[in-house]
Amino acid sequence: NQNELIKYEKIILSVTGEKRAEILSNEKELQNIDVVYTSNCVRTLQTAKYLLEKQNLKVNIDERFDERRPGKPNSDKVPDWYERQFFDENYKTEGGESQAEVRQRMSEAFEEVVKDNKGKRIAIFSHGNAITFFLLKWCKLESVNTNRNLCLSFNNKIVFNKRINSPDVFKITLNDKNEVIDIENIEFEDLD
């Protein structure tokens, strides 16, 4: 439904979300960024704005970095829909996107951004499920549970083992052939 999609894209950050975004902009790993890409969702732009202002950067908006279209989970008929979307890359809810579809569009956007910005430090602001599905291109899903805790590994090393939180920061390191050689979840100072 187009109206639902537009409403979803216009969701704004909470006051806490704004504070977390400002703290995130001070994260050491996010300094000296050359180029920034975001989805076209308002809350993603709001998360990026502090980094953009501090580093005097312009934003590049690409809707391919948008969150997965959730559709209608229909948990009455499919009570395990949340776990199923991780274990079956082609599963999708009515009107929603599958893991494979999200990964495809995220991968196309990522590869284009990397190709167009060779040798630059790139920050991409996207969304929890979309990023997770994208990371599954290289990571192994070790587990997911009904509490929405995820465990991901890369090259037999656990890189994420908790619930996706907004924002979460993942660093993807590429070699000179643009092959992924490392993935890590960057912890940052938070409100606690």
PLM features: residue spans?
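Acidic, low-complexity terminal tails and accessory targeting/binding regions
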Residues: 60-61, 67-79, 118, 136-192
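Phosphate-handling substructures
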Residues: 11-12, 53-108, 160-164
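Short catalytic/ligand-binding loop motif for oxyanion handling, primarily in non-cytosolic enzymes
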Residues: 1-2, 44-47, 69-71, 131-134
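Beta-strand elements within well-structured catalytic alpha/beta cores of enzymes
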Residues: 37, 117-126, 130
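Active-site-proximal alpha-helix that buttresses catalytic centers in soluble enzyme cores
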Residues: 1-57
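Glycine-rich phosphate-binding loop signature in dinucleotide/nucleotide-binding domains
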Residues: 29-32, 113-120
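A generic secondary-structure signal
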Residues: 23-27, 108-113
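Short glycine/proline- and charge-enriched loop/turn segments
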Residues: 2-9, 83-86, 151-152
